[in-house]
Structures are given as C-alpha cells and as structure tokens.
C-alpha cells in the first residue's frame, strides 16, 4: 500500500515527491497525545497527606472549617494558617518516581497532565504541560478578583493586600466554588489518544467525569493502590498498585502503544 502511494505521489508531484515523502515521515513521527489525570495518591508517596484521612479529617481539620467560602468568611485567619502549613509541606516535598516517570513519557508522547493536586511536583519532575484543576498552593490571589494572581513561597497574613486593595487568599478552588479550568480539561481529554488515571479513585466530581470525555475505544489505564468498583472503571486496564510502582508498569505497557495507536 505504501509503495503504491509512493509511486502515485512520484507520478503526481514529479520533482516534489521527496517533499511528499518527508510529510509522510513527519506524520509518522508525530507523538501520540497521552492525557494523564492525577489525584492525591500520586503526591502521597512524596509525604503529602491525601485529601481525607480515615477519620474524615484533612490534616486534623474538618473540611468545612478550612476549605469552603463560608470558612473563609467565618475565620480567614484559620484558613490562612491551614494553607500556610500546607505550603511549607509542599516546599519540603520532592517529586517521586511516579512524577518523574510521567515526565519521562514526554520523550515518546505528547503528554498533558491534568491534576487535582495543588502542589508543583509535576512541574518540578519535568512535566511541561500541567493543568491544575483545583488551583495552586504556590500562588495567591485577590479575594475579589480571581484574575489578580501572584506567585508566593511565604506565608499569607491577614492584612496582606492585592493591588486592588482586597485581602489576598490562597489561589485554591474551594468546595462549593466553580472549577474554572474544567472546560479546558474536558477539551484536552477529548483529544486524548491514550488516557491514564493515577492516584485517584474516580469518585470526586467533576474531575472524575473527565474520563467520559476521552474518545471511545482508546487505550485507558487506572493506577491506584485501592480501586473501588464503579461504572467509571469498566473497559479500562486496572493497575492496582501504588503510584510509583504502577507508573513503572505503565511505562512498559506504553512502549508498543506509541507506534500502534
């Protein structure tokens, strides 16, 4: 088939047929789009606690007391204290083998990471296309204007103001707030040629719904140390391992995919 196309091109394009062949070569070398959705489980192995402990608390706090707009209105000092501590924890943490393993896949794939995590471990591991669904702990913003966003590595205090005069708050999407990046994430998922879920059990929405936006019939994988059965994990390759171990296994499974997708 390729020889027939080659001869047809040679006849049709004449001296331009080498250009045609070069275009075919570029198409064959185009990296396949690998979309990865990551959750708290991938950063847990770097020492960052998951969103809920077994007792239903988050770093010893009730979610409602530190991660909702109502909490911010009721006790902003407590909220700032909570996120200041989390920021320190993130700065002390280091990317683990799962983070670096996903970054290494960029050698063979066009990797897009969509993360529910607010840390920067994907970026520090070398990932170049990272979309943060729930905000970033190393950024802060005006409480009145979500377009006024600033980098930060220190604490935020009551009285710290944005340029519009409003109090600065963590650049985090709290519970009961809309998820601004969800539409962009849906678009990315819709272009996937392979979809991988790491460190999340697919029970927290709207992020869990992203898998449904991936094209039907593409290779799909889920990596987590404990995967509950839900309709979301049907027709998907399950790797029930911790993220660091599972991403290593994934690398082997993806070796042939870069040519066969």
How would you label these PLM feature ranges?
Residues 14-16:
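Compositionally biased, low-complexity intrinsically disordered regions
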Residues 2, 20-261:
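Conserved catalytic core of sirtuin-type NAD+-dependent deacylases
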Residues 4, 11-12:
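Polybasic, lysine-rich low-complexity intrinsically disordered segments
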Residues 10-11, 26:
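Intrinsically disordered, low-complexity segments
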